[in-house]
C-alpha cells in the first residue's frame, strides 16, 4: 500500500517545493510509493471543506508530513498543529521551516515596526491602513516549526537539495534513519587554507582569485582572500554526493543556508572565533547578529534595545 503524504507551506518563497520537482526521474519512482493526499501547491484541497461547511480546519491523515516555511501568522500555527496531529512522521523542509530562514530576519524588529515599514514607509507603497482584518493575525515573531510542534526530521537548505529530499523520503519508506551531517562546510571545502592574516574584508562584488578551468583544490580559501564566508559555522551537506559545497563550486562564499552545526551551536560565537584566526576584526561587519544568523534567526534574533 502506498504511503500517504501531506505537505503544507507557510512563510516561504516556494523554492523547496520546486526542489521536490527537481528530484527528476527518481521522483517517478517515489510517486509510485506515495499517495499525495494534501499539497496546496499542487492540488485544491479546502481546509474547511469544499464549500466551507466545516467549522474547523482539517487535513487528511498521512504517514508522512512535510512542512516548508516558518510560522509567521496564527493560521500557520494552527495548520502546524493540525499537521502534527494527522501525520505519523513530520519533516521540516528547508531552512525556513528548520530555523526561520530569511523571513526570521524580521525578528530584530517588533511586529508594529514591520507593519509600519511595509505598509506605510517603503518607497513604493501608497500609505494606507494595515490589512489586519483581511488576513490572519501575525504572530509576535517568526517561529521555526520545531518551536511550535515536535518535528521528527529536519532537511535544511535554502532551498534544500533534491538529493536530500529523495534520500530522506526513501529512507522513511524503507524504515531507515536519515542523519544530517555533523561536519562544517569548511570540512568539505577543498580549497587551500594557510591561516594567513587578512586584515580587511573585501566586498563580495570583488572577484576572488582563481584560475578558470583549474580544480578548486588549487584555489585559496575565500575567507583567507578576505571574503566573509560562513562555512566555519554552517552544517555541511549541501554538496550531496559531489561533496564540494554548492556555493564554493560557483566560486562564491558560503551564505550559511544549511544552518548551525548543531541545535545548541551559536553561529555568532563560532564565526567570531574563525575570524580571529585570520586576523579579521568582526567590527568590520555592520550587522553581526543578523549576518551570522541570516538563515537561523527564529530562536536567535530579537529586537535590539532602541537608543
Q: Model-found features: residue ranges?
A:
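Short gly/pro/ser/thr-enriched loop/turn and capping motifs at secondary-structure boundaries
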Residues: 96-101
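Short glycine-/small-residue-rich Rossmann-like dinucleotide-binding loops
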Residues: 69-71, 95
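Short, hinge-like loop/turn segments at secondary-structure boundaries
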Residues: 107-111
Amino acid at each position: 500500500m502506498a504511503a500517504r503524504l501531506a505537505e503544507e507551506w507557510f512563510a516561504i518563497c516556494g523554492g523547496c517545493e520546486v526542489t521536490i520537482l527537481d528530484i527528476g526521474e527518481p521522483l517517478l519512482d517515489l510517486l509510485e510509493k506515495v499517495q499525495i493526499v494534501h499539497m496546496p501547491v499542487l492540488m485544491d484541497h479546502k481546509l474547511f471543506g469544499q464549500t466551507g461547511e466545516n467549522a474547523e480546519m482539517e487535513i487528511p491523515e498521512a504517514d508522512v508530513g512535510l512542512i516548508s516555511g516558518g510560522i509567521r501568522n496564527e493560521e500557520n500555527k494552527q495548520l502546524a498543529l493540525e499537521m502534527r496531529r494527522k501525520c505519523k512522521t513530520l519533516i521540516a523542509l528547508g531552512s525556513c521551516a528548520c530555523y526561520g530562514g530569511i523571513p526570521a530576519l524580521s525578528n530584530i524588529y517588533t511586529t508594529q515596526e514591520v507593519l509600519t515599514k511595509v505598509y506605510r514607509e517603503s518607497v513604493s507603497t501608497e500609505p494606507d491602513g494595515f490589512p489586519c482584518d483581511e488576513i490572519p493575525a501575525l504572530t509576535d515573531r517568526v517561529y521555526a516549526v520545531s518551536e511550535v510542534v515536535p518535528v521528527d526530521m529536519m532537511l535544511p537548505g535554502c532551498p534544500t537539495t533534491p538529493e536530500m529530499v529523495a534520500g530522506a523520503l526513501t529512507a522513511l519508506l524503507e524504515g531507515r534513519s536519515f542523519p544530517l551531517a555533523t561536519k562544517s562546510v569548511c570540512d568539505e571545502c577543498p580549497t587551500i587554507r594557510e591561516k594567513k592574516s587578512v586584515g580587511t574584508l573585501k566586498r563580495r562584488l570583488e572577484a576572488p582569485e582563481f584560475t578558470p578551468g583549474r580544480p578548486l583544490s588549487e584555489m585559496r580559501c575565500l575567507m583567507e582572500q578576505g571574503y566573509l564566508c560562513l562555512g566555519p559555522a554552517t552544517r555541511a551537506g549541501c554538496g550531496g554526493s559531489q561533496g564540494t559545497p554548492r556555493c564554493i563550486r560557483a566560486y562564491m562564499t558560503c551564505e550559511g543556508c544549511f544552518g548551525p552545526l548543531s541545535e545548541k551551536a551559536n553561529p555568532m560565537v563560532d564565526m567570531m572565533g574563525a575570524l580571529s584566526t585570520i586576523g579579521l576584526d568582526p567590527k568590520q561587519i555592520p550587522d553581526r547578529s543578523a549576518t551570522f544568523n541570516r538563515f537561523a534567526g527564529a530562536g536567535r534574533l530579537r529586537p535590539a534595545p532602541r537608543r
